[in-house]
Every structure is written in C-alpha cells, then in structure tokens.
Regions:
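Extracytoplasmic
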Residues: 3-174
C-alpha cells in the first residue's frame, strides 16, 4: 500500500512539475540552468577567470550555487553560514570554531560577500556591518563571529565587486 501511494505521489509531483516522468533533454537543461541567473553568472564568470580550479572560494552568505556553477570548492563544510551567526543555534560556538579551523587550514583564494542582496547576512566590511540592522535572530551577533571577522580583516583585502549584484570580492592580502 505504501509503495503504491509513493509511486502515485511521485507521478503527481512529476505532472505538477510540468512534464512526464522521463523529461526530454531540453527540459533537463532548462532545469539545470535555472539557478544561473544573469547576476549569479557574473560572479561565476569572475571566479572562473580569477581563480584556478584547485583553489577554494568562500561565498559568504547563502549562495552555494555560485561554488557549484563555478566549479570552485568551498573551504568549509558550511557552504551557507546561517548557523554561525544565528543566536540560540544549538552548536553555534562549535560550528564557528570548526569554520575558523577550516578557513585557517584551507584559506580561500577569494571571498565573495553576498550581504548586499541578502539582509540576513552580516556584511564582512565593518562599516557596512555597523549600518546594517539585522533581524533579531542575528542581533547581536554571537561572540565567536568577532574572531571570524578579525581573521578575514587580517588576511583579505577588498579588490572588486561583481557587477549587478554589488557583491564585494576579497582576495588574500599579498596576492
């Protein structure tokens, strides 16, 4: 009975998604490129041009599709960082410690700050961070975030922005 219901649900979802269970190749191609908006494409193109395939890239915020589409690995298991700066998150301190250790052992060649288009993401730039009013779940930021901001400020310099998104781009100091 559960198997029949499961198959019926799968078929219903496939029809609702706009096509047969075995979608033609062109629909699959459209689905695959859907997250690649013009704005994200600018960031992806920047990374493909300015980083090597073996270099890691930290996309600060909640845009792991940029790592995926640029074929650049994240330096951390935290491909989106909401748990790091959410007050009351069960393991926020341990998560921040792990994140810092991962960034220290695998320093990203480039850091892209997506906070310009996501009000839930605290900006990496101190002046922008002071001006930003974060939602109550993120304000004040957990104390461990200060260590992260200090690490990034000591090791990275802003070099560019990524076009229409106005995402700040940081490179390792001295590179």
């Amino acid at each position: 009975a559960y198997r029949v219901r499961g198959l019926a649900l799968f078929a219903l979802l496939a029809v609702m998604a706009g096509g047969p269970v075995h979608a033609p190749a062109r629909r699959i191609a459209l689905f695959r490129s859907a997250p690649e908006t013009a704005a994200k494409r600018t960031a992806v193109d920047y990374l493909r041009t300015h980083t090597g395939p073996d270099e890691t890239v930290l996309v600060w915020g909640a845009e792991p599709s940029v790592n995926f589409l640029s074929r650049r690995k994240s330096p951390s298991r935290y491909s989106f960082q909401y748990p790091l700066y959410t007050n009351g998150y069960r393991n926020a301190a341990a998560a921040a410690e792990t994140f810092l250790a991962e960034l220290s052992s695998r320093p990203p060649a480039v850091v892209i700050d997506t906070s310009a288009t996501n009000l839930l993401v605290p900006p990496l730039d101190p002046a922008s961070r002071r001006r930003r009013r974060l939602p109550s779940a993120f304000d004040p930021l957990p104390p461990a975030m200060g260590n992260l901001f200090d690490l990034l400020a000591a090791r990275y310099r802003r070099v560019d922005g990524t076009g229409v998104l106005h995402w700040a781009v940081y490179r390792q100091a001295g590179r």
